[in-house]
C-alpha cells in the first residue's frame, strides 16, 4: 500500500491510496464464496451452484462490494499508520478499475487542527468576592414568607405590594388591538410583569373605580406591531387585596426542609445560598476563562465538526420546546452555526489544555460534586445511589470536573483581579446568562 497525502484548503486533506491487485482478487474470491453459500438458483441445491454461474450472476455486485470495503479498510489503515486526526467522514473517489491491476482511489477529508495554546497570560479574569450577609438571609426568608402569603380584600387604595383583579381594554389610535383585552385578570403588583407605567397607573385607585392609563410599549417588545406604540388602557378595578405574611413560627419553619426552629431554617438557607453562590462564581470564572481562550486562540475548526454540532443543537432545541424529533431537520442550520463553531473551538482548546498538562479527572472531586448536587434534594442518599447506578450521568459529572480542572490550570496563568459583589448582583447576573 503506497500513500500520498495532499494539503488542500484550510483543514481539508486528500490522500491517494493504492490496493494490490492480488489482495483485491483474494477478497473477491471470498466474497463469491459467501454468495455461493446462500444463492438460490433454479436447478441447483443451495450451496452447490457452480462458481461460473455464481460469477455470472453475482460477480459485478461482489466486485463492487470488495472495492467499497477495500477503500474503507485501506483508508482507515492509513489513518492509523499516519496518525491522521480525522474529523468527520471521508469522501471516496475511485479511479477507473482494470481487472487484474492494482486499484487506486482518493479520499478527501478534514482533520482537526494542531493547537498550540498561546496568550494565556493575556487572559483577564475578574474573580467575584462575595459574603452572604444577615440581610441576604433575611431577604430570602422574606421570599419564603411571600410564597406562603394569604390575601385579604381591602377597601384602601392599591399599593405597589398589593394584588388586584381588573378588567382592561387597550386602544392604539382609538382602536382596540389584538391581545389587549382581559376580564377578571389577576395582577400581582410590584413584579414588573406588565409594560412600564401599567402597574404605576393602578397605584392609588380603589376597588370599583374606572380609569384610563396612558403607556408606551417598549421598543424591544416581543410583538412587532406594538413596538414603541403609544396606547391607552381603560381599567376597571374590581378588587384590591393586601398581602398577609405568615409569622415566623415553628409551624411555618417545618414547611421548609428538615429545620425545626428559625435558627435551623436560617442555617439551612445559608447553606443553600452558599451552594448557589459557589456554582454561580464558578460558572462566571469559567465563562471568562473560555472567552479569553477563544479570543487568544481563534483557531480554525473542521466544517464537518461544526455540522455535527449543529445537529446536536437542533435536537436540543426541539427537545427544549417539546417538538417531535423529525422537526429538527426543518430548523435552519444558520440559526446554530455560530454557537456550533464556538462549541467546537472551546472543546478543542480545553482538550488541548487537558492533554498538554496531562490532567486526569479527580475522582474524589467527582464524588464531592455528586454529593453537592444531591444535597439540594430531600433524600440526598437516593440521588447519590441513582448516580452510582447510572454510568452516563456519572460520566457527565466527570466531564464537568475535568473541564473545571482545565479552567483552573488556565486560571493560574491568567491575570486575575478580585472585585467585591453582593449576593444579589452575582445571582442576577447568573440568571441573565
UniProtKB/Swiss-Prot annotation:
Lineage: Bacteria, Pseudomonadati, Pseudomonadota, Gammaproteobacteria, Pasteurellales
A GO MF term: protein folding chaperone
The organism of origin for this protein: Haemophilus ducreyi (strain 35000HP / ATCC 700724)
GO cellular component, as recorded: cytoplasm
Catalysed conversion reaction: [protein]-peptidylproline (omega=180) = [protein]-peptidylproline (omega=0)
GO terms (BP aspect): 'de novo' cotranslational protein folding; cell division; chaperone-mediated protein folding; protein transport; protein unfolding
PANTHER family (UniProt xref): TRIGGER FACTOR CHAPERONE AND PEPTIDYL-PROLYL CIS/TRANS ISOMERASE (PTHR30560), TRIGGER FACTOR-LIKE PROTEIN TIG, CHLOROPLASTIC (PTHR30560:SF3)
Listed Pfam families: FKBP_C, Trigger_C, Trigger_N
Gene3D superfamilies for the chain: 3.10.50.40, Trigger factor ribosome-binding domain, Trigger factor, C-terminal domain
Known role: Involved in protein export. Acts as a chaperone by maintaining the newly synthesized protein in an open conformation. Functions as a peptidyl-prolyl cis-trans isomerase.
Domain of life: Bacteria
Enzyme class: isomerase
Keywords: Cell cycle, Cell division, Chaperone, Cytoplasm, Isomerase, Rotamase
Family affiliation: Belongs to the FKBP-type PPIase family. Tig subfamily.
Gene that specifies this protein: tig
Domain characteristics, as noted in the entry: Consists of 3 domains; the N-terminus binds the ribosome, the middle domain has PPIase activity, while the C-terminus has intrinsic chaperone activity on its own.
UniProt name for this protein: Trigger factor
Residue ranges of domain PPIase FKBP-type in the record: 161-246
InterPro entries: PPIase_dom_sf, PPIase_FKBP_dom, Trig_fac, Trigger_fac_C, Trigger_fac_C_sf, Trigger_fac_ribosome-bd_bac, Trigger_fac_ribosome-bd_sf, Trigger_fact/SurA_dom_sf
Subcellular location: Cytoplasm
EC number(s) stated in the UniProt entry for this protein: 5.2.1.8
Amino acid at each position: 500500500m503506497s500513500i500520498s497525502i495532499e494539503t488542500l484548503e484550510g483543514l481539508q486533506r486528500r490522500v491517494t491510496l493504492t490496493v494490490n491487485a492480488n489482495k483485491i482478487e483474494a477478497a473477491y474470491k471470498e466474497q463469491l464464496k459467501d454468495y455461493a453459500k446462500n444463492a438460490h438458483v433454479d436447478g441447483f441445491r443451495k450451496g452447490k451452484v457452480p462458481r461460473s454461474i455464481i460469477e455470472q450472476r453475482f460477480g459485478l455486485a461482489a466486485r463492487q462490494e470488495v472495492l467499497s470495503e477495500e477503500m474503507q479498510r485501506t483508508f482507515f489503515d492509513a489513518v492509523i499508520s499516519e496518525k491522521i486526526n480525522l474529523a468527520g467522514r471521508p469522501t471516496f473517489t475511485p479511479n477507473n478499475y482494470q481487472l487484474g491491476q492494482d486499484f487506486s482511489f482518493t479520499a478527501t477529508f478534514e482533520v482537526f487542527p494542531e493547537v498550540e495554546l498561546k496568550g494565556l497570560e493575556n487572559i483577564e479574569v475578574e474573580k467575584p468576592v462575595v459574603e452572604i450577609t444577615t440581610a441576604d438571609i433575611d431577604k430570602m426568608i422574606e421570599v419564603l414568607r411571600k410564597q406562603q402569603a394569604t390575601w385579604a380584600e381591602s377597601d384602601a387604595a392599591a399599593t405597589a405590594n398589593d394584588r388586584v383583579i381588573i378588567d382592561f381594554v387597550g386602544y392604539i389610535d382609538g382602536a382596540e388591538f389584538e391581545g389587549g383585552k382581559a376580564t377578571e385578570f389577576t395582577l400581582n403588583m410590584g413584579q414588573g410583569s406588565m409594560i412600564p407605567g401599567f402597574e404605576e397607573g393602578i397605584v392609588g385607585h380603589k376597588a370599583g373605580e374606572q380609569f384610563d392609563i396612558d403607556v408606551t410599549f417598549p421598543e424591544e417588545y416581543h410583538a412587532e406591531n406594538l413596538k414603541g406604540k403609544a396606547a391607552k388602557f381603560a381599567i376597571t378595578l374590581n378588587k384590591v387585596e393586601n398581602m398577609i405574611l405568615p409569622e415566623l413560627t415553628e409551624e411555618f419553619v417545618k414547611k421548609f426542609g428538615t429545620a425545626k426552629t428559625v435558627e435551623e431554617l436560617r442555617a439551612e438557607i445559608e447553606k443553600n445560598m452558599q451552594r448557589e453562590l459557589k456554582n454561580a462564581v464558578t460558572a462566571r470564572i469559567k465563562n471568562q476563562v473560555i472567552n479569553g481562550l477563544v479570543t487568544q486562540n481563534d483557531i480554525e475548526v473542521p466544517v464537518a465538526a461544526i455540522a455535527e454540532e449543529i445537529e446536536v443543537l437542533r435536537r436540543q432545541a426541539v427537545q427544549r420546546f417539546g417538538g417531535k424529533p423529525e422537526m429538527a431537520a426543518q430548523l435552519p442550520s444558520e440559526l446554530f452555526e455560530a454557537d456550533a463553531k464556538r462549541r467546537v473551538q472551546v472543546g478543542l482548546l480545553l482538550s488541548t489544555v487537558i492533554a498538554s498538562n496531562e490532567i486526569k479527572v479527580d475522582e474524589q472531586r467527582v464524588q464531592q460534586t455528586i454529593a453537592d448536587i444531591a444535597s439540594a434534594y430531600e433524600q440526598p442518599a437516593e440521588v447519590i445511589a441513582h448516580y452510582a447506578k447510572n454510568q452516563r450521568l456519572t460520566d457527565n459529572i466527570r466531564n464537568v470536573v475535568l473541564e473545571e480542572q482545565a479552567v483552573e490550570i488556565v486560571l493560574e496563568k491568567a491575570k486575575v483581579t478580585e472585585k467585591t459583589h453582593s449576593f444579589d448582583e452575582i445571582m442576577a447576573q447568573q440568571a441573565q446568562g
